[in-house]
Amino acid sequence: MDATEFRKFGKAAVDYLADYLENLRDRPVLPSVEPGYLQEMIPKEAPTQPETWQDILQDMDRVVMPGVTHWHSPHFHAYYPTANSFPGIVGEMFSAGIGCIGFSWITSPACTELEVAMMDWLGKLLNLPKEFLNCSDGPGGGVIQGSASEATLVGLLAAKEKMVKILQADHPDWDQGMIKAKLVAYTSDQSNSSVEKAGLLGSTPMRLLPTDEKCRLRGSMLEQAIKEDRENGLIPFYVVGTLGTTGTCAFDDLEELGPICNRENLWLHVDAAYA
């Protein structure tokens, strides 16, 4: 595909998506297909020759759309909002078109600095203390993660590393292996499955704590778990609260959890699904 064909395909794709989103309310939210439906509609082997973009658009209607759950439909009331928008789609187009990899400043200065600026904007909108901002003299500054699941895992790994450094500074004779074997994290039994998976990937026990009658994690439940684990020689270090759990849309009581985490020196990560 050359630039001329790309222009045609791109304009046709924009028209397709605009029509789709404009008429989304007329589509059934859930697809009426059975598991494995798509395998019967596509070749068994990867094509050896490319298809035209016109054929690809036809395949969108014939193969893909029948199996789509329409998250942006006004009739969709499950899970959490995904915040799609026309400007967001155009932003994704620019991101994909430029296609830079921003793992360091020199790989794409604009990518790195735009992320820093946007996260500072968000911090100011949330009225966070200046210590949380990149423009302060402290260690603050935000980083955009690829998904909520990734953010939970990265938070766990960062909290784990921080706790190991703190304990080794206080107890130079303690080795990392001994410390990590005693670390324990907490979340509610209503949290997303990705939280428990973060514990598995981070080689850390993730205790699923019981919730109250409104399916919320409360401070008393966390305090009891911390007390039990400390008495058993374990080291609490990480708590995951949720704003809008997947199954029940429960909001954990952060006003109770926050002070406990401060007092006990635990890292509090919030899965802000409904933020």
Each predicted region: which residue ranges?
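A generic structural signal for short coil/turn motifs at secondary-structure boundaries
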Residues: 10, 247-249
